[in-house]
UniProtKB/Swiss-Prot annotation:
Chief site of localization: cytoplasm
Gene behind this protein: cdc123
Organism: Schizosaccharomyces pombe (strain 972 / ATCC 24843)
Keyword Magnesium attached: yes
Protein name stated in the entry: Translation initiation factor eIF2 assembly protein
One Pfam family of this chain: D123
Binding positions for Mg(2+) per the UniProt entry: 239, 241
Family: Belongs to the CDC123 family.
An MF annotation (GO) of this entry: magnesium ion binding
GO cellular component entries: cytoplasm; cytosol
Lineage: Eukaryota, Fungi, Dikarya, Ascomycota, Taphrinomycotina
Entries under PANTHER family matching the protein: CELL DIVISION CYCLE PROTEIN 123 HOMOLOG, D123 PROTEIN
């Protein structure tokens, strides 16, 4: 089987496309679409800027001041729109763009969590993520039917800001599930640590995942990958991705997934085996991280204080 990726497959996997179909199967969320133009411009900027309190902003009245003016930041109306959505979702959210959650930007947090309680935290996480940058610039890479030869996203494409209600998730019961011809061919745990209880409960998890898949029968593509979180005998739909190597196969290679027969009665199940080296998560997304001196600058600071300190250090180095 030779895998082919199309533009429609990618579009079907953007959050707003499937959330409208499966709203009752997934945690509560709000979609701001189109994303405010000033937010989109901020995400495309090269530098990271943290908003200053209104009473500290000085009027730029000279050429020298203009040269040292802070980098671009979204308008107040856009900030208020995000703050309103956060409040409506209970005061804490997990942000994402059309496809990607900024999991690779956890290095900029002091909590190791995607939990955001302010618009500034939302924007800083999105701005610091290579995954989000890929959404912005290369979402249609590898699509055989996409016109732009370099895979770049059209300028008139409608990006969306997704804010998902935050709640604590135990990584041990997150699974990635692979579907071919509408059949569950395989699934595996997402976390890379061994959990003894998973094996004894795996039959129950398989049934919950299979039951959830039946409710996804209106998804337009026969082949896709979906993520679930199992909690208290319920499988929650977390995300949907294309059945294509750009989606991480985790404990499966894509050559294995391509060769699996969708007619098999039982899906292939893989868990981290006992005796595997425990993971602290420190190596995950290692290449997305930053020099040690930037991390050292964050000691004792919250997210925004850390970013402001790093901005000050960067400005001094450029003097």
């Amino acid at each position: 089987m030779t895998l082919i990726l199309t533009k429609n497959q990618v579009l079907h996997c953007q959050f707003s496309s499937w959330y409208s179909l499966f709203r009752k199967l997934t945690p509560k969320a709000k979609v701001i679409k189109p994303i405010p133009a000033t937010v989109l411009k901020y995400l495309h900027e090269d530098s990271i800027y943290v908003e200053q309190p209104m009473n500290t902003v000085e009027e730029v009245d000279s050429e020298e001041d203009e040269e040292s003016a802070p980098a671009y930041y979204p308008e107040r109306e856009a900030i208020q729109l995000i703050e309103k959505a956060i409040k409506e979702l209970g005061g804490a959210v997990v942000p994402k763009l059309n496809w990607s959650t900024p999991k690779d930007a956890l290095w900029i947090t002091t909590t190791g969590s995607l939990k955001c309680t302010t618009a500034e935290e939302v924007l800083l996480l999105l701005k610091s993520s290579d995954f989000v940058a890929h959404d912005l610039n290369h979402a249609f890479d590898d699509c055989k039917d996409f016109d732009n030869a370099d895979g770049s996203v059209p300028k008139d494409f409608s990006f969306e800001l997704v804010l998902k209600e935050w709640f604590p998730m135990h990584a041990s019961t997150e699974f990635r599930c692979f579907v071919k011809s509408k059949r569950l061919i395989a699934f595996c745990q997402r976390d890379d640590n061994y959990y003894e209880f998973l094996k004894e409960n795996i039959d129950c998890y398989e049934k919950l995942i299979s039951d959830l898949l039946k409710k996804l029968d209106t998804f337009p593509d026969p082949d896709f990958v979906f993520d679930v979180y199992i909690h208290k005998d319920r499988a929650w739909l977390i995300d949907i991705n294309p059945f294509y190597p750009r989606t991480d196969g985790l404990l499966f290679s894509w050559s294995e997934l391509e060769s699996m027969n969708s007619e098999n009665m039982k899906p292939e199940i893989r868990l981290i085996p006992k005796g595997s080296m425990p993971s602290t998560g420190s190596a995950k997304y290692y290449t997305n991280r930053v020099p040690f001196d930037m991390i050292a600058a964050s000691e004792g600071e919250n997210l925004l204080e850390f970013a402001q300190k790093w901005q000050d250090l960067t400005n001094k180095s450029n003097e």
